[in-house]
From Swiss-Prot:
Protein known as: Serine hydroxymethyltransferase
Predominant subcellular localization, coarse grouping: cytoplasm
Annotated site, Plays an important role in substrate specificity, chain positions: 228
Assigned GO CC terms: cytosol
Modification N6-(pyridoxal phosphate)lysine occurs at: 229
Taxonomic path: Bacteria, Pseudomonadati, Pseudomonadota, Gammaproteobacteria, Enterobacterales
PANTHER family named in the record: SERINE HYDROXYMETHYLTRANSFERASE
Amino acid sequence: MLKREMNIADYDAELWQAMEQEKVRQEEHIELIASENYTSPRVMQAQGSQLTNKYAEGYPGKRYYGGCEYVDIVEQLAIDRAKELFGADYANVQPHSGSQANFAVYTALLEPGDTVLGMNLAHGGHLTHGSPVNFSGKLYNIVPYGIDATGHIDYADLEKQAKEHKPKMIIGGFSAYSGVVDWAKMREIADSIGAYLFVDMAHVAGLVAAGVYPNPVPHAHVVTTTTHKTLAGPRGGLILAKGGSEELYKKLNSAVFPGGQGGPLMHVIAGKAVALKEAMEPEFKTYQQQVAKNAKAMVEVFLERGYKVVSGGTDNHLFLVDLVDKNLTGKEADAALGRANITVNKNSVPNDPKSPFVTSGIRVGTPAITRRGFKEAEAKELAGWMCDVLDSINDEAVIERIKGKVLDICARFPVYA
């Protein structure tokens, strides 16, 4: 018999210890990985609920199982909130991840072998936008586009590639691009050749929801996002659209279920619903504005300290530090900062001479530190510490000194107060 007092700590000490150690790590490390964030206790409450027990294949009102009257309410709340938040008239909240959402869009709109324009991974794109190691690069004929010498998307080259290759789809979106994308221009290019414009806004969805970054929904045929990252919800995916046909929406739904998934994760969908409600609050807008301010503040310090930032700045939550001129690898920088309890990720930079496993850059993002309460002053101080470590990458005394400062500021700005 199941009893409510059952717990992991008493039953599985080995697992519980690892979970507790991760909790401590999150509190005592500064998180600067651009795709990571801290979700609210409300979201975690939803994910740890009895909704995890319920199978609900199908969609609200059209399920293959009985007993779905309450999970229908949960999913419909998530759908309605997603549509309201992003100005969409279609939303599918079932994708288990951003990659699953992207797979569903490709399945709905493309045939294997179709030509697709996607942002070059080395220029800031994402694995699922046509990388040869990913399903997207294996199933479709991918033509990459990239950034120009200033570090911004080269729309002239994009248009030229589009007219030359006549792709069935153009993919907008990125995983390591710090500029503002001109969604209207991309739609104009797509329309000129009769292609779909599909936008993956996973990285900037929270900024979009708060009006801090341009919304692609009015411009794209289809938009996907993750529900974590800047949106600060549970790990999962979401598909949105506006002004499309019922036929398109049926195709998208069918591509998710039964095309790519079986039963939806109702406990995660409940987490999405509450996160979407949180994203409608005034304080969420203030938070996203601060995310962007903190990123700019950090860039300022890196530039002052003689570090090169790809595209020279940032207009969102992330930026890339190019370490080629410093004769450092991203792998070395990642490891040294990690020893100071500062977590970043190594990242390729444009025309990177190193392999993707070594790289010549680091990606820095501000969603998590801002969630802790950091403002510009703390962001600048942190950037200075990072430069101290990178300037003396083999000096363990410097790294230890910075680690002490990190532990102090983490205690002053707890993740969960």
